[in-house]
Regions:
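AMP-binding/adenylate-forming catalytic core of the ANL superfamily
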Residues: 98, 104, 115-117, 389, ...
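Conserved AMP-binding A3 loop
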Residues: 39-43, 176-203
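Conserved pre-ATP/AMP-binding loop-to-beta segment of ANL
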Residues: 24-26, 159-180, 187, 212-218
Length: 539
């Protein structure tokens, strides 16, 4: 017997129609390069996205063609998030922070036909234009520059196109967007998102025990729209009818706080480096920003520290940890306390909240051991985290040599080493490649980093394993101090000794002005390992 429900395709046009039909007067705000604010509504985005679809079709867009973007967090990028897939194309957001050689490889590997680039980023495009042959280059006048010769003007194309648009018969499993991983381990890899995955992911992010995005929210996405499907925020905000505030090319802490105050932001999303800067500004300028309403900050991309969480709570902000990957669209876990946990001690509650949390609804997770057995949920047994679900990638685009990243029964092997406790909360111990093997025992670099960043003088800390003649590897910590503070190796060693066994504490502390990072804000440990490859340990 079959169910008697409508067979209604889960496609992006449904989200766009909802945004216009119910929330058409809700604002979308963009900070422009001159720091002025441009305002329009979901209704305006609806019309312009449909114009974009017509314009792309007139330029010759075919079903499944890839349209690349080289744009900041701006309204035109939001328009592309909808305009490209409703035309039957595949939106491909290029990570503008990658090396030009890598951008060229990605665009060629994806087979991008068209490029939409804003005039502010034309210098970035110039660095790889000779290596990628786009059929059309469409320039957005974000900074007000004249469209270069040989390119199409974005506003001119939209002005010539009609708002009247008939959606093609899109299938929910058709490709809607794609994004490449940041390439920390070898070449960047393409992840292709279906309409169905995006719609289900968006509905999930509106859930109470998830991002909890609603029509009452004003959302500030500080996570780049060109990274990891923009954390799904354009589609989630359309589903919920939330106001969206886009920071444009700016990520300075004071500018972020100005936007939060002026636009009454209730939800911000970003990586730890952004939030560290915002917290530092709040601490340095007490009382400058009058933000008296509840604000939720979601943090992903790297582990949060207790010091960061406690710091924001001093200022009345709440912080929630997330976990996901480009391969998971990207939301897969979030960390919220269960009702029975509210009676726990403060220390125990912080410990639980700093975990990556429980898998979100209809995403499954397991810990697998090297011998192929599944680990118990005891909060101790460490193995590789594997996940599966309706918005988890089943393979990489045109890279059959990467098939080993999936288990024989179809689970994604994340490369993260983790354990799961009795309540189902996942705690990442480290990336498998970043664990330190010392004297036959494993040491977590992440735990050491988070502990070090709890020291009042430490701004950032990255820990790596360095070859040792006796112990195989020993931990070395690279530390950036807060401005105007001092700390010495002996002091930091003593600070860590309160939480770690003596053999787990780094044998060396190197003080630096900055730590190299990836394009998405993670520590670039490959660069650190190369830097300290010839490190000589003291006898």
């Amino acid at each position: 017997m079959r169910g008697l429900m409508m067979d209604f395709p889960l496609t992006i046009p449904a989200l766009l129609e909802r945004a216009d039909g119910i929330f058409g007067n809700v604002e979308i705000v963009t900070r422009k390069p001159d720091r002025s604010l441009a305002r329009y509504t979901w209704g305006d985005l609806y019309k312009r996205s449909r114009r974009m679809a017509n314009a792309l079709l007139r330029l010759g867009l075919q079903r499944g063609d890839r349209v690349a973007t080289l744009l900041w967090n701006q309204s035109e990028h939001m328009e592309a998030y909808f305009g490209v897939p409703i035309a039957g194309g595949v939106l491909h957001t290029l990570n503008l922070r990658l090396h030009p050689d890598e951008i060229a490889f990605i665009a060629n590997h994806a087979g991008d036909r068209f490029l939409i680039v804003d005039d502010v980023l034309l210098p970035v495009y110039e660095k790889f234009r000779d290596r990628v042959k786009f059929e059309r280059v469409i320039v957005v006048p974000f900074g007000g520059a004249v469209t270069p010769e040989g390119c199409d003007g974005y506003e001119e194309l939209l002005a010539e196109a009609s708002e009247d648009y008939t959606y093609p018969q899109l299938e929910e499993n058709e490709a809607a967007a794609m994004c490449y991983t940041s390439g920390t381990t070898g070449r960047s890899k393409g992840v292709v998102y279906s309409h169905r995955a995006i719609v289900l992911h968006s509905l999930n992010c509106c859930g109470v025990d998830s991002f909890s995005v609603s029509m009452r929210d004003t959302v500030l996405p500080l996570a780049s729209l060109f990274h990891a499907n923009g954390w799904g925020i354009p589609f989630t905000a359309a589903t919920a009818g939330a106001k969206v505030v886009l920071p444009g090319p700016f990520a300075d802490a004071e500018g972020i706080l100005d936007l939060m105050e002026q636009e009454r932001v209730t939800l911000g999303l970003g990586v730890p480096t952004v939030w560290f800067g915002v917290l530092d500004a709040l601490d340095k300028h007490p009382g400058r920003w009058k933000i008296s309403w509840p604000v939720r900050l979601l943090i992903g991309g790297a582990a949060a520290s207790e010091a960061l969480m406690r710091g924001f709570e001093r200022h009345g902000f709440s912080l929630m940890c997330l976990w996901g990957m480009t391969e998971t669209t990207p939301h897969a876990c979030c960390s919220l306390l269960r009702p029975q946990m509210h009676d726990w001690t403060e220390e125990k509650k912080y410990e639980q909240r700093l975990k990556q949390g429980t898998p979100t609804a209809i995403v499954e997770a397991r810990i697998m051991m090297v011998d192929g057995t599944r680990a118990s949920h005891d909060g101790k047994t460490v193995g590789e985290l594997e996940v599966r679900g309706p918005w988890i990638a089943s393979s990489y685009y045109n890279m059959p040599e990467e098939a080993h990243r999936w288990s024989p029964d179809g689970w994604l092997r994340t490369g993260d080493m983790a354990h799961i406790d009795e309540y189902g909360y996942i705690k990442l111990v480290d990336r498998s490649k970043d664990l330190i093997k010392s004297g036959g025992e494993w040491i977590s670099s992440v735990d050491l980093e988070n502990a070090l960043m709890g020291h009042p003088s430490v701004k950032e800390a990255a820990v790596i394993g360095v070859a040792h003649p006796k112990w195989q590897e020993r931990p070395l910590a690279v530390v950036v101090l807060n401005e105007g503070t001092e700390a010495h190796a002996a002091e930091l060693r003593e600070f860590l000794a309160a939480k770690f066994a003596k053999w787990q504490v780094p044998d060396a502390f190197v003080f630096a002005k900055e730590i190299p990072r990836t394009s998405v804000g993670k520590f670039r440990k490959t660069a650190l390992r190369e830097q300290f490859l010839d490190w000589k340990w003291e006898s």
